[in-house]
Amino acid sequence: MITDTHTHLYSSQFKEDQPAMMQRAKDAGVTRFFIPAIDSTYTDVMLQLEEDYPKDVFLMMGLHPTSVGENYLEELAHVKEWLDKKKFYAIGEIGMDLYWDKTFLTQQQDAFRTQIQWAKERKLPINIHCRDAFDEVFEVLESEKSDDLRGIFHCFTGTLEQAKQAISYNMKLGIGGVATFKNGKIDKFLNEIDLKHIVLETDAPYLAPTPYRGKRNESAYLTNVVDKLVDIYGLSFDEIAAITTQNSKDVFGI
């Protein structure tokens, strides 16, 4: 059993072949799919996905940092409304993204901190999006750290030191296609990180692993990431799959 801890299965890129794509994933051994939220415009398609695959799909709720704009308080109200009326398995994806634009830096910080507090109140894990913002994300995590806070640093692409810092905040590292890239860098030090801190993800339809880089990603390709971790850790395919799936259960509680 392999767990994809971060996949956008509701993406319009899967519109034409979603059932076939899901079957390919299951044939490859990927049987658990955790679905991050972006903003209110995606809620309906996420709920439909859960209805279509009730035994396979586990939803998160949250406001993505690139969706934080002038109306972010309305978006946060939408997140809270849904958290109050339905079961979700994490709050995410949340965090900070300064790659595209720093206009709403303060608002991103506020949204991140607010959603972390909701997660702690509800004893839910968080799923962190961090792009060009490690210092800013760590600053918020430092101010909010507690025994009740746990989660995943989605699509981790930092340094060894940043990996250790993320782990110190009770975060697992979400490892996906980037680990297979020649210039991905994280594969150079992953063997220094205990496998108990690692979970698997695709971030599909983005960041397809080698040899599919540049193409649409899908959950079936997670086996390529497992193969890479087999090389790095010297364990069997089944051992990597079992350990990382157990790690995901430790985070999500299911």
Language-model features, listed with the residues they occupy:
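Mid-domain alpha/beta scaffold segments of enzyme catalytic cores
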Residues: M1-I254
